[in-house]
């Protein structure tokens, strides 16, 4: 992902203000509620029968933290997203058979949740930069697909 110095600064500033585990849990939870067909990958997570069940589910929260920790690591390697996410791409492609379109949906959920959490601190410039990043991460995660 090619980012200007201003975009990198906007990302660093915004990311420094969020509680990553909360963003990850809420973003994954929202993905499962808004796009219920994505729940099929999480059969072992227990009750996902309603929005409140999903958003309160401890396994959703824990996996959301794993997801956002990987995303956060990607923010440290913006010049090599494909390399950074290569093993996760392979896992999601070869073993889990996740539709790569879901990565784009989750990226958008991350941006939405960040906007919700940061309010006015999530400037249009920060949003534009994060949209580039989540698109780059989705592309990197889809890289191993044939």
From Swiss-Prot:
One Gene Ontology biological process: hydrogen peroxide catabolic process
Annotated positions of the S-nitrosocysteine modification: 93
Residue numbers carrying Phosphoserine: 44
InterPro entries assigned to the protein according to its UniProt record, in alphabetical order: Globin (IPR000971), Globin-like_sf (IPR009050), Globin/Proto (IPR012292), Hemoglobin_b (IPR002337), Hemoglobin_oxygen_transport (IPR050056)
Tissues in which the protein is found: Red blood cells.
Domain named Globin: residues: 2-146
Residues modified as N6-acetyllysine: 59, 82, 144
Keyword Transport: yes
Residues bearing the modification N-acetylvaline: 1
Tree of life domain: Eukaryota
Binding locations of heme b: 63, 92
One GO CC term on file: haptoglobin-hemoglobin complex
Alphabetical keyword list: Acetylation, Heme, Iron, Metal-binding, Oxygen transport, Phosphoprotein, S-nitrosylation, Transport
GO MF entry, a single one: haptoglobin binding
Pfam families recorded: Globin
Entry similarity comment: Belongs to the globin family.
Function: Involved in oxygen transport from the lung to the various peripheral tissues.
Subunit structure: Heterotetramer of two alpha chains and two beta chains.
Record protein name field: Hemoglobin subunit beta
The organism of origin for this protein: Spermophilus citellus
Lineage: Eukaryota, Metazoa, Chordata, Craniata, Vertebrata
Primary gene name: HBB
């Amino acid at each position: 992902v090619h980012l200007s110095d201003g975009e990198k600064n906007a990302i660093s500033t915004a990311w420094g203000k969020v509680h990553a585990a909360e963003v990850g849990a809420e973003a994954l939870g929202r993905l499962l509620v808004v796009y219920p067909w994505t729940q099929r990958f999480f059969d072992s997570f227990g009750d996902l029968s309603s929005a409140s069940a999903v958003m309160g589910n401890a396994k959703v929260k824990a996996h959301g933290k794993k997801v956002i920790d990987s995303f956060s690591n990607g923010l440290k390697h913006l010049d090599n997203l494909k390399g950074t996410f290569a093993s996760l791409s392979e896992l999601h492609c070869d073993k889990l058979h996740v539709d790569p379109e879901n990565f784009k949906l989750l990226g958008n959920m991350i941006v939405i949740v960040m906007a919700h959490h940061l309010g006015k601190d999530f400037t249009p410039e920060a949003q534009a930069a994060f949209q580039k990043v989540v698109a780059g991460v989705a592309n990197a995660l889809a890289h191993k697909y044939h």
